[in-house]
C-alpha cells in the first residue's frame, strides 16, 4: 500500500488566515500584539501617503527581532506551534498573538510586505520580502511560493527607524535601538480615512496596560491632526461590575479573577439628598 501526502493550495492557506482577520483594524491589532510578544517596550504605527497609490503602513518595534533560523522555522511556518509551547516571552510576558497565522495579518492589510529585523546581540540584520498576490494564482500550492531574504547592516535598519520616527515628531526622545523589527506594508487593501483611524486608535487603547506603567507604550502617527501621538489607556468609571483576571502560566495553570462592584448604593443617596426627600412634593407620587 502506497502513501501519499496532503497538499495545501496557496489560496486555502491565505483564506484560513483571512478568516481570523475579517477587517484591517483587527489585522493591525494582531501585529501590535506581536510586538508585545517580542518584549518591545514601544510600538510605533505610522500611516504615510494615505489616499495615494503610495500609501504605506509601518509597524515598528524595539523587541527581540528575528534571525534567519527563526524567520524560516517560525515566521515562514503557517500554523507554527511555537507560541503554543512557548507561552511566555524571554522577559516573562504572556504571549498574546495568534498561534502561527499572524503573518497573514500583513496580507490582510496590503499586497506587498517588506520586513527589516535585527536580532538581539547580532551584527547582522535581515530584509524579508513577499508578494502576497502569488497566493491567488490558480494551481499554486504553498510550497510553490517563496519569500526572499537578504542580509543587511543593522545600522541601515536603525537609520530607517530613526528617520521614520523623528520626522513624525510623535515622541520627544527616540529610544536607543539595538534590536527590533520594521514592517513596511504597501499596495494597501483598504481606505484609511479619519473615521477608520479614529476607530483604530480607540481600539488600541485596550492593548495599553491598565496600570501606571511604562512596560508597553503605543504611538500612532496619521495625517490627521487629532490622531497622532501616544495612545492612552482606556479609562471608564461608569460601570456596575468590573472583572479583572491574571493568568500565572504556572504548572497549575492558575487563573485569578477579581470582581469589583460599583453599583448604585441607595442608602448613600438617601443620606446625601436627605433634605430633598423632606419636601412635601417628594412625599407623594409623582414627586414633582
Question: How would you name each of these model-derived features?
Answer:
Residues 1-185, 194:
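GHKL (Bergerat-fold) ATPase N-terminal catalytic module, capturing the glycine-rich phosphate-binding loop
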Residues 142, 147-288:
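N-terminal assembly/transducer modules of large multi-domain enzymes
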